[in-house]
């Protein structure tokens, strides 16, 4: 990391009024260089170093004026300094994976900035569960991971066969995946792993080999997620890949289920878990709650549907008064989740005496191969809703928006949809309980805009 980047990551972004930081003269824009002579790299490193010295510490500051300060602080262990550093600067991935989503973005269209970032950052892996390939870790990175016990980490494997993995990643540098994983594990780091499954490339015997080689690291390798490849309509100049269809999904479920049963018999856990999309595409039942353990992979699309179904049933049986004001509205989602959401919206209608209609939005922005709700655009939602809008309001997936303005990835907002459709529009929340509240609170605020 460059000196400039490191300095940016240690700049103070926020000072809490009345805090220790304010009392000792720290200011926004000051740069934290060291804690007790130990150099600081970023916000995560800063928090770790503070934990080493809970009572007495000296912070070396580079003031905005250019002065160097050494600030001595005595505090109680539970006392917070009351400052925040700048966000961690993302390390960029130098792989060129044949299925990389960033390479498949539509050219010449508005795209949310974060979608254009190819991150490969062990800090984001630890903090947010982002997957990394381990191809850009330096010796310094390894030592920091060991020292700070940054565990678990999330590793994109895709294939354990070196030649196949090299082809998938399109990276000419030496890889040593299994050796690096072994090193992490021997130093106390636990791992979650994933394979993005591509028909006729890393499936079949290659998939079996990957599963068995990763299983050798269990329980230090906690899980393996198997996720279907996502292909947009914008793959000009990229390798030709086959998408996952219903027939392939059925075949994969049959193949992996057999392996899961064998592993569960020998290890007490299925170990490898298929993404929900496989079951939906194949028209198969979602596995029971017991299949997923404590649901460690929901953010990777594994067990999310089972969570939704179970939570929906819990909410549905909660005692509620019948609405005084008729509730009529439209709920939109992506094509893949539509049959499930529609089924449970119908149950909600019957039980709560309300009138909601669920509609599926096709993704014209990325193409029909991308069918998840989180990647819907405002324009596509409008195009579908203007023809099928029912009732007094529209509820859209919260995961398709970001920020206080509720911005879709094509820079449309909820306000834009309201303007064009003539009805209130809001997000349905990230939990089933939030979804129920966002609907039922309309009883008391039918003509207001209520964003969850």
Where are these regions (language model features)?
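Radical SAM enzyme core and accessory elements
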Residues: 1-7, 11-12, 283-452
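Short alpha-helix capping/helix-loop boundary micro-motifs
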Residues: 16-21, 42-44
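Terminal peptide-recognition signature
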Residues: 21, 29-32, 46, 59, ...
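Conserved PDZ fold ligand-binding element
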Residues: 23-41
């Amino acid at each position: 990391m460059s000196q400039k980047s490191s300095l940016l990551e240690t700049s103070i972004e926020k000072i809490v009024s009345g805090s220790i930081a304010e009392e000792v003269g720290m200011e926004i824009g000051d740069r934290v260089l060291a804690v007790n002579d130990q150099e600081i790299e970023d916000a995560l490193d800063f928090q770790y170093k503070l934990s080493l010295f809970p009572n007495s510490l000296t912070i070396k500051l580079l003031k905005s004026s250019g002065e160097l300060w050494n600030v001595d602080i005595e505090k109680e262990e539970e006392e917070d300094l009351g400052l925040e550093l700048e966000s961690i600067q993302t390390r960029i991935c130098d792989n060129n994976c044949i299925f990389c989503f960033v390479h498949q973005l539509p050219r010449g269209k508005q795209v949310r900035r974060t979608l254009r970032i190819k991150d490969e950052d062990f800090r984001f892996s630890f903090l947010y569960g982002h997957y990394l390939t381990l191809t850009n870790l330096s010796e310094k990175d390894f030592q920091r991971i060991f020292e700070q016990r940054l565990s678990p980490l999330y590793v994109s494997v895709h294939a354990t066969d070196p030649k196949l993995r090299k082809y998938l990643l399109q990276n000419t540098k030496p890889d040593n995946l299994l050796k690096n994983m072994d090193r992490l594990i021997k130093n106390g780091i636990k791992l979650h792993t994933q394979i993005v499954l591509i028909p006729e490339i890393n499936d079949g015997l290659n998939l079996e080999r990957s599963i068995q080689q990763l299983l050798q690291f269990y329980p230090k390798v906690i899980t393996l997620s198997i996720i279907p490849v996502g292909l947009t309509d914008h793959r000009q100049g990229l390798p030709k890949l086959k998408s996952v269809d219903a027939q392939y999904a059925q075949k994969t479920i049959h193949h992996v289920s057999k392996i899961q049963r064998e592993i569960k018999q020998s290890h007490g856990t299925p170990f490898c878990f298929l993404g929900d999309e496989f079951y939906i595409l194949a028209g198969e039942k979602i596995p029971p709650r017991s299949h997923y353990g404590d649901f460690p992979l929901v953010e990777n699309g594994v067990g999310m549907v089972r969570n939704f179904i179970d939570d929906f049933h819990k909410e549905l049986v909660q005692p509620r008064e019948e609405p005084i004001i008729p509730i009529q509205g439209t709920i939109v989602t992506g094509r893949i989740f539509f049959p499930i959401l529609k089924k449970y919206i119908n149950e909600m209608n019957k039980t709560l005496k309300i009138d909601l209609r669920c509609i599926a939005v096709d993704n014209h922005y990325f193409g029909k191969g991308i069918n998840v709700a989180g990647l819907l655009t405002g324009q596509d939602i409008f195009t579908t809703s203007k023809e099928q809008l029912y009732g007094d309001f529209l509820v859209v997936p919260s995961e398709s928006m970001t920020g206080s303005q509720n911005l879709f990835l094509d820079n449309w907002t909820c306000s834009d949809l309201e303007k064009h459709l003539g009805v209130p529009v809001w997000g349905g929340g990230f939990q089933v309980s939030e979804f129920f509240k966002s609907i039922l609170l309309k009883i008391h605020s039918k003509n207001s805009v209520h964003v969850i």
